[in-house]
């Protein structure tokens, strides 16, 4: 195979790897939990992973209760649930 074809094949494989969605196999189970504001009245902007949108989204946390799918920053949410 010529070097031009190998380079084209490598480029196509790289593109495919970048565009193929990552499966949730390595994602913690709590990332699948819904956003829960909790039962207190605080106003704490937070982030959760929305599996339907495959993205981290903002929500308001009340300060107590809730579940593990709650992050202080969108970066923390991405590191944990998106990969």
From Swiss-Prot:
CDD domains xref list: Kunitz_textilinin-like
Keywords: Disulfide bond, Protease inhibitor, Secreted, Serine protease inhibitor, Signal
Main location: secreted
Domain of life per record: Eukaryota
GO CC annotation terms, alphabetical: extracellular region
Membership in a protein family: Belongs to the venom Kunitz-type family.
Family annotation (Gene3D superfamilies): Pancreatic trypsin inhibitor Kunitz domain
Function, in words: Serine protease inhibitor that strongly inhibits chymotrypsin (Ki=84.6 nM) and trypsin (Ki=391 nM).
Organism name: Ophiophagus hannah
Pfam families per UniProt: Kunitz_BPTI
Site (Reactive bond for trypsin): 41-42
Protein's name in the database: Kunitz-type serine protease inhibitor TCI
PANTHER family: KUNITZ-TYPE PROTEASE INHIBITOR-RELATED (PTHR10083)
Tissue: Expressed by the venom gland.
An annotated Gene Ontology molecular function: serine-type endopeptidase inhibitor activity
Signal peptide segment: 1-25
Residue pairs linked by disulfide bridges in the UniProt entry: 31-81, 40-64, 56-77
């Amino acid at each position: 195979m010529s070097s031009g074809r190998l380079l084209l094949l490598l480029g196509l494989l790289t593109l495919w790897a970048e565009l193929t969605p990552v499966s949730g196999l390595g994602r913690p189970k709590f990332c699948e939990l819904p956003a829960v504001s909790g039962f207190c009245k605080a106003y704490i902007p937070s982030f959760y992973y929305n599996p339907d949108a495959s993205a981290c989204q903002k929500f308001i946390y009340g300060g107590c209760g809730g579940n593990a799918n709650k992050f202080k920053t969108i970066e923390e949410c991405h590191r944990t649930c998106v990969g």
